Each structure stands twice: as C-alpha cells, then as structure tokens.
Amino acid sequence: MELYDLTIHELRDLLRKEEVSPEEVLDSFYKRIDEVEDKVKAYVTLTRDEARNSLASLKDGRLAGIPLAIKDNISTRGIKTTCSSKILNNYKPPYDATVVKRLKEEGGITLGKTNMDEFAMGSSTENSGFYPTHNPWNLDHAPGGSSGGSAAAVAAGEAPGALGSDTGGSIRQPAAFCGVVGLKPTYGCVSRYGLVAFASSLDQIGPITKDVTDSALLLNVISGHDPMDSTSVDREKEDYTTYLKDDVKGMKIGLPEEYFSLDFNSEVKDKVMSAVKELEKAGAIVEEVSLPNIEYALAAYYIIAPAEASSNLARYDGVRYGYRSENGDSVRSMFTNTRSEGFGDEVKRRIMLGTYVLSSGYYDAFYLKAQKVRTLIKEDFERVFKDYDVLISPTTPTTAFKLGEMTDPLEMYQSDVFTVPVNIAGIPAISVPCGFDSNNLPIGLQIMGPHFGEGKILQTAYTLEQALNMKTKRPKL
C-alpha cells in the first residue's frame, strides 16, 4: 500500500516510529497529486515550496509531518485565498486563520488550497470561478459542495485529511458523495476567525477525513475557545479520541419520521436502514421520533443565509483588495462593474435574494419569520435530545449527480434537505459512508447530536464504521 492510501493516524504511527520521514510522506502526496489532479481538479493552489520549507522547522506536535489540504475560504498567510471567486483572485491574506495556526503549531503541513463553490454557495463545486471538481468515484459526477475540492482530495488520496466549512451541509454532503467522513461541529466549537464569511450565524469549520478516528484527531487540534472569535464558546477542552469505542449498547437512537417519509432515492434509504439495523444488532435502541417544524427548515435557511451573505459580501468593492473593474467613469460605476464582473451567477442570485428579504416592507414577512421558525426548529431538537442520544438520517436524498445535470437552482437547493436543519439549530453532525448504489457511487449516513455532543456522534460513527468495514474502500483512478 502506498503512503497516500494511509489515514492520518497510520501515517502518524509510522512517523513516530521513524519508519518513514516527513519528506517521504510529503513526496508521496505530491506524486499522487501529479498523477491524478488533472482528472480530479481538487486544488486551486498547490503550496509545494511552502510545504518543503516548513519541513526544516517542523514542530513536534500531534500532527508532526502530516500534510493537509485547506479549503480556499480559510485564510492562509501569504498563500492565495480566493474563495474560488474572480473577485478575490490573487488575494493573499496577511494572517492565518486560527484553525490553520493550530494545525501548524501541531506540526501540520499545508499541501494546498482546495476548490469550492464560489464563496461556499452551492452543492456541486460547479459554481467555482475556476473549474468544476470531479468525483473520484466517477469523474463524470459531481463531488458535492461547497467543500467538493476537500472531499475529492481526501477520496482520491491527494490528501490524508482536509478542512472544509459547513453552512448548510457543505462538509457532510461532499463527504457523502465522495465516500469519506465529514464532521460539522457544534456552532462555537471551532473558531471562525479567518474563515471568509458566507452566513456568520450558520458557518462552521470542520474536518474531512478517510475515517472517524482521523476526524476526532483533527477536531482535537482545531477545537477550543478563541478570543479572536466572539461566537467561540469558552468551555473545557475534550479529548474526542476517548469516544472512539465500538460500543452503542443501550444508546437511544431516533429516526426523524419527517426525514424518512420524504420521497427520496430508494437505494439510499435501504442502505441507511440496513446500517441502522447493524447498530440495533450492537445493542442500540432505535425508535421513530418527530421534529414537526423541520419541514420549514429549508425555507428558513434560504432566507437567513442569503440575508447574511448580502451583508457579508458588501465588503467586496474593488477598493482595498481583490479584483477591480477597469470599466467605469465614477466610483459608483467602478463598484457596480467590479461586483457585476467579479461575482458569479449563484453568488449574485443569493445577494439579490438576501437584499430583498432584508428590505423595508419585506423584513417582517420573510427574515423575522424565518428567525422565529429557526427558534422552533432548535426547540424541536432540544426536546428530542432530552430522550435520545443521537438522531440518524441519510446525509443526502440521492447519490452524486452528473456534472451539468442539476441545472435548476431550486432543485439544487432541495438536495440540502437533510443537512440544513443541523446548521439552523447549531448542533453537531457527522456523515459516514454506509454503502454504494448500483452505479458504485457512495452513500452517506448522517448522525446528529445535541449541542457539544460530538463525543456521542463520534462513538456512534466509529461503531458503525467497524460494523460496515467501509474505511478501506477507495476509488480507482
């Protein structure tokens, strides 16, 4: 087996025993990138020189010598951070995001920045301002989004792990499509300092990895209070690896009836239910539960997220950094032309929608109502988690669709139906592979937990991973 096929914890063990050197590990991944990147297109920037230079001053931490990929909306000092948008082309931040700083402090090495839907707006990575990323399991299919580059890089062996961001499913959905593990932590568990904002009350950074153990390892490093982020929660640090036990005996698992009653792909439903049966065999108690307000989650999300985006994206004007239009005979026309030329269609669509729902006369009818619905959804989850340890659903209603197939924006928005409620409520959730459809495309299962219930979802995910033996499955490129 090649080094690029190994997990983070397997590489770490080899490095600690000095059976391989950090140089050999790094070379293995760049060699793999050279072999398959033209097909996958997971990266927008590769940082070979920076990575090799960092070997000379490598810190002896928990990730010493481990190369990682970073989504292109997470700030990296002196390295292009474009959000896959023309408007931020050539922008190099003067600082590292807190998560990047923490990875470096533990000896992590940045391989490069991964492709994404522009400003994290999309579910296919087709909205990238550069090029679409391809699913390593079938290159004609989408890897999901918006963290499609991160998920594809991990699945293709172009990185042992990656960071993504999740606003409405952007870590979990591509993880499901690419057959890897994607963890969206509790809102406030991981610092957002240095994350380019899409919807500030929904965004959260998390890991995408080959197995559940690696997700726990990366969460150990990136989680924790950060005074630079006012939404970061100051609580005692946990060691998430202590939850990696193959044991769900007596655990109460809820299946939300509002999810399972929806009309979605039968192969996805069958594989998820068969995985749930494995947990029952392992001693878990599985019961149906109700989240009555969940049906309004998608509508509320597509009001709140664009509203926050229209405010956050107002800062891109061509004056201080990024793209500036050469057309225009006044400051006002320069602003207008810069934004018209610099933003892609999906970003413009969401800015316009957000501006509309925040405008006078419509604020109460849309934005205020959506926030009230958000409270009801949070209360639904809080009520259910009084009696249940975790909830389980499919991660996505379908497996990966073909690139160019999903042309209707509303249809694309519907694909977030299982993931969005988690962000609305601010709770943690993980997507783990649970099988394949008849076309050999991966299927993901989502495990949701209460606020700061990462331990419970990791324990459930780990047990499932052991039962299904999915972590050894890799695409052939």
Swiss-Prot record:
Q: Name one GO biological process term.
A: translation
Role summary: Allows the formation of correctly charged Gln-tRNA(Gln) through the transamidation of misacylated Glu-tRNA(Gln) in organisms which lack glutaminyl-tRNA synthetase. The reaction takes place in the presence of glutamine and ATP through an activated gamma-phospho-Glu-tRNA(Gln).
- Example GO molecular function term? ATP binding
Q: What is this protein called?
A: Glutamyl-tRNA(Gln) amidotransferase subunit A
Q: Which organism is it from?
A: Halothermothrix orenii (strain H 168 / OCM 544 / DSM 9562)
Keyword rRNA processing assigned: no
Instruction: Describe the family membership recorded for this protein in Swiss-Prot or TrEMBL.
Output: Belongs to the amidase family. GatA subfamily.
Database matches in InterPro entries = Amidase, Amidase_CS, Amidase_dom, AS_sf, GatA
